């Protein structure tokens, strides 16, 4: 795989995880 493909896969994997963490922290504060 090229560096671009690796970066794309990492981004696709990390974005939902980051969004879930942000949503979870927001819900925990409310």
Curated annotation (Swiss-Prot):
Principal cellular location given in the protein's record: membrane
Signal peptide boundaries: none
One GO-annotated biological process of the protein: photosynthesis
Membrane-spanning intervals of the chain: 6-26
Record key words, sorted: Membrane, Photosynthesis, Photosystem I, Thylakoid, Transmembrane, Transmembrane helix
Domain of life: Bacteria
Transmembrane helix as UniProt keyword: yes
Protein name per Swiss-Prot or TrEMBL: Photosystem I reaction center subunit XII
Species of provenance: Synechococcus sp. (strain JA-2-3B'a(2-13)) (Cyanobacteria bacterium Yellowstone B-Prime)
Gene name of this polypeptide: psaM
């Amino acid at each position: 795989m090229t560096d671009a493909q690796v970066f794309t896969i990492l981004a696709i994997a990390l974005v939902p995880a980051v969004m879930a963490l942000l949503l979870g922290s927001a819900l925990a504060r409310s």
